[in-house]
């Protein structure tokens, strides 16, 4: 799905769907990342090529590379009215995609009205289970950032059936990751594209605008909630802390 954004009075079509301001989103993280967020008043933006998922920013699988290049060749051939397409043009397309991937910094959120057990297990599993989630809305996130950045939904696709173009690649993921219901922020360096960019960037935020409430892992011990409350107090952030509702006792 696509939407439009307005920049300096000009309307541009996006290659992603933009969540409405009242869309509920969550940021799940371990305690260290939570403390870093509070200490720096900034979101940690990971470079796209540093994610564990090797398909982050990919246009196709390696085994489909020949077919992908043939499709590119066909596209440019039509564009050039049947003239021979220089090999360099195809190479430049791949270089442009790798450069954009290397200069894109991402921060990922989960979209949903309720908590996700799958996300808790990703970020707060193990013996200590010291995980934290921030609940907010897309509108609050925009206000907290205070400047224009790209915020959009991920579209989950089957790479054996469709390939994203260079602009779409960072807004597409494999269908196996659909459980993430991801909304992401993307920024690029202000200085422009570089072949030697920083490994991460920090995006300043207003914490009181950003955080609606804080939740602690359903696997965490009861004392952990008090620890999180003390940490918030230390950084002068007055927000409610809840123990995850997924730990409620069942009646049979």
Please provide the spans of the model-predicted regions.
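Partner-binding and oligomerization surfaces adjacent to conserved cores of proteins
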Residues: 1-252
């Amino acid at each position: 799905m696509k939407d439009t954004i307005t920049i300096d009075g000009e309307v541009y079509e996006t290659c992603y769907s933009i969540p409405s301001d009242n869309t509920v989103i969550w940021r799940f993280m371990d305690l260290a990342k939570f403390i870093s967020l509070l200490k720096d008043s900034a979101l940690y933006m990971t470079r796209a090529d540093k994610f564990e998922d090797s398909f982050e920013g990919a246009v196709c699988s390696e085994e489909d590379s020949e077919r992908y290049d043939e499709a590119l060749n066909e596209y440019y051939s039509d564009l050039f009215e049947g003239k021979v397409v220089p090999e360099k043009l195809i190479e430049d397309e791949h270089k442009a995609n790798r450069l954009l991937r290397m200069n894109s910094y991402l921060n990922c959120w989960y979209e949903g009205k309720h908590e996700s057990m799958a996300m808790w297990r990703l970020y707060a599993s193990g013996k200590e289970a010291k995980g934290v989630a921030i609940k907010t809305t897309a509108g609050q996130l925009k206000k907290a950032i205070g400047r224009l950045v790209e915020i959009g939904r991920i579209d989950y696709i089957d790479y054996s059936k469709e390939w994203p173009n260079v602009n779409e690649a960072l807004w597409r993921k494999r269908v196996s990751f659909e459980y993430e219901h991801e909304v992401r922020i993307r920024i690029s360096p202000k200085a422009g594209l570089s072949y030697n960019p920083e490994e991460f960037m920090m995006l300043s935020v207003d914490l009181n605008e950003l955080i609606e409430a804080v939740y602690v892992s359903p696997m965490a011990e009861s004392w952990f909630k008090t620890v999180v409350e003390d940490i918030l107090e230390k950084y002068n952030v007055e927000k409610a802390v809840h123990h995850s509702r997924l730990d409620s006792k069942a009646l049979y």
